[in-house]
Amino acid sequence: MTIQQTPEELAQEVKRLVSQLQAQGRNDLLLRAIGVPLLEELRIEAAKGKLSRLVITKDYRFILVDYNNKEVELQPVHKAVYLLFLAHPEGIEFKRLADYREELTRYYMATAKMLDKEKIIEGIDHLVNPLDNAIHEKCSRIKKVFLDMMDEYTASYYYISGHTQKRFAGSSRIWYERLKIITLPRDLVSRLELFEETGIVFGEETEV
């Protein structure tokens, strides 16, 4: 009769096997056994203890509630870009931003209520133009703001970063999507109420 091991016992067995592989210098086999997707899940799980919930208020203030309610100071255009990437955890290629023009415009109009509509449209034109450097500049600014607030490892979950994904078509065609994503687990993103202007909904309602 086989005695079923408890999760804790299985964890100890895994730890023992990992130690044996590392002692033999075979991290390559360890990585192959774990797999990259699981490795990323483990990385996120390990970081959760350091990550703060991000609360987006009804007037589009970005608050890190677990870091003493620190506010992420961003201009309306940066907030609009950030909201777009938050809404698409699957990632977006910069060269395809024009496909998200309408959605990005809604976010910008919601975050920049005092700005003239023509100025908003002009700003969107720059952002979705693949020959313009505007989106790179905005993402660099967002990255700097988070780096100024926390260490680089923690900040990497909050800012917009690159992720290359291998794609297959049939038996011979292979191509790569160069996606830009925010890796922050979406269960850490909350809102104080539904965003009626944009239709965007993140996580659960919470209080600051």
Residue ranges and their predicted role:
Residues 196-208:
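Extended catalytic cores and adjacent scaffolds of nucleotide/polyanion-binding enzymes
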Residues 1-40:
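Long, compositionally biased intrinsically disordered regions
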Residues 40-51, 134, 139-197:
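DNA-binding patch around the recognition helix
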Residues 25-26, 35, 49-50, 112, ...:
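Short, flexible coil/linker elements and helix-boundary hinge sites characteristic
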Residues 115-133:
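Intrinsically disordered, low-complexity acidic Ser/Thr-rich regulatory segments
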Residues 71, 75, 129-136:
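Short, solvent-exposed loop/helix junctions and linker helices
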Residues 30-83, 88, 189, 195:
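Short boundary/linker motifs that mark transitions into or out of structured domains
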